[in-house]
């Protein structure tokens, strides 16, 4: 619930705006027109394009998802990206108050701005974005899914994740890693992986008896004439954060030494670029970049951080792509002599009103939701105030 102080500040600001002869916020912002071409505009660079999506949480359709108003960093993480919010975040990334990106990336004036800019995400819009990038960049594109994909919606609960599995089959990622997927249980996860059509990579998931890998730890892909080694890092604390009985025979952990060995093995096989597809969370990934040499790019998931610029840690590029289908990350790389000579990045906001739905994905979503339409349309209650995720606590 909004505090008395927050209400007073908001009410005072709104009154001042009108008293000064200004227009209501929604009318002031209506002039910022969003187009699909503008959202997809990008100055291409180099020979590799990494496209990253993560933490869909089975959200097939557009959502109103407010970014947190509090994001507490502990110790050395305090006050550093991504542990800044609101006005501080907007100052750090030079975002104008009330702009489309301010709405997408921060929490202030969320309800009012939502009336202007609308919902975000939707797998049919995400599909349009990804198809456009693939059409532009061809065989340079590597699409990677950071996990938390198959579960957490009503339709995914009813279908044991099959609605999202089928949606991702249309999206055609080259690889994925996992976290909440494991709450489907070992047998169901194995069943899905066997028919997935692309690898689930997780170097840090081992069977309890022999400590052997349950899934492939890594895979080499050729893109744009570059050999790319992709390592999967599933959420390391799954048995703690989720019920242990769901994955009784598997162990997790960060497995830093094993990760270093995986990097060395990939380099030995000729990999010119090492990408960690991670569900560790941003702070753990930043620490890994400091501690484990040889990682060129970390695509970070789990903590839902949407960061509009690359975070550079030594020689590692760290990318955080948000959640719930609100964003697609595009990272163009100029790879030469087994190193990154240059890069260009954009966190693409998926404004549902501005992006044309992909017809194939749209048809799948409608078919997947149709058997549950009565449940999905049921009104459970009405709130007096906005409900939202408070933050990371």
Feature map (PLM): residue ranges:
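Acidic, metal/ion-coordinating pockets
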Residues: 2-356, 360
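Hard-cation-handling environments
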Residues: 356-393
